[in-house]
């Protein structure tokens, strides 16, 4: 089966797909697929994640964390034998999903302050997730030079985040009073006062 251009437009996203599905003699089906997508509504992103390569914990977290935002554009590639899908280990087969987000609202976890106005580049490559944050806001501070990674989607490994926050020092103390950190830092941070900016 071969198609150079399959177009699917929904209220949540527009897609254009190139598809080649080949049955080789005495071989499993071989898929070569590339989809370009744009004008996505991030609130409906769960319908389009590559869930076959993601652990239930990761899928659940993404489903509850992303509240709103845009997906201006991206691309998905699946290349390889369907017998090897979902390509969890390195081989001649691959699955990649790369896309941008704009003005995303992310509720990281209960008890944590949400991230707003999040612009990022998201990359699912094989069994790994990488996120390069261009900008975001927490309170009235700016999140900058930030990268996040999940080394293994199946089984799920921890989300690791490294970055910087620029803004009023008082926001750092405020963050320590949030439910997620209060037990560890609340007593120490409560009497502190701060002036000026951190960067």
Task: Describe each model-derived feature in a short phrase.
Residues 1-6, 30-106, 152-199:
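Extended amphipathic, helix-rich lipid-handling scaffolds
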Residues 14-18, 73-75, 119:
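Membrane-embedded beta-strand positions in outer-membrane beta-barrel channels/transporters
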């Amino acid at each position: 089966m071969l198609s150079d251009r399959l177009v699917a437009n929904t209220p949540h996203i527009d897609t254009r797909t190139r598809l080649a599905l080949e049955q080789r003699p005495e071989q499993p089906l071989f898929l070569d697929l590339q989809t370009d997508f744009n004008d996505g509504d991030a609130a409906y992103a769960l319908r389009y994640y590559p869930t076959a390569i993601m652990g239930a914990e990761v899928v659940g977290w993404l489903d509850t964390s992303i509240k709103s935002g845009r997906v201006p554009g991206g691309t998905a590639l699946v290349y390889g034998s369907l017998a090897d899908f979902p390509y969890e280990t390195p081989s001649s087969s691959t699955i990649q999903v790369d896309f941008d987000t704009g003005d995303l609202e992310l509720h990281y976890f209960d008890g944590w302050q949400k991230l707003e106005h999040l612009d990022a580049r998201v990359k699912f490559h094989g069994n790994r997730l990488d996120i390069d944050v261009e900008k975001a806001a927490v309170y009235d501070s700016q999140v900058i030079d930030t990268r996040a990674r999940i080394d293994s989607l199946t089984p799920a490994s921890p989300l690791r985040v490294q970055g910087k926050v620029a803004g009023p020092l008082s926001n750092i103390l405020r963050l320590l009073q949030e439910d997620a950190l209060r037990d560890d830092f609340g007593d120490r941070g409560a009497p502190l006062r701060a002036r000026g900016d951190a960067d």
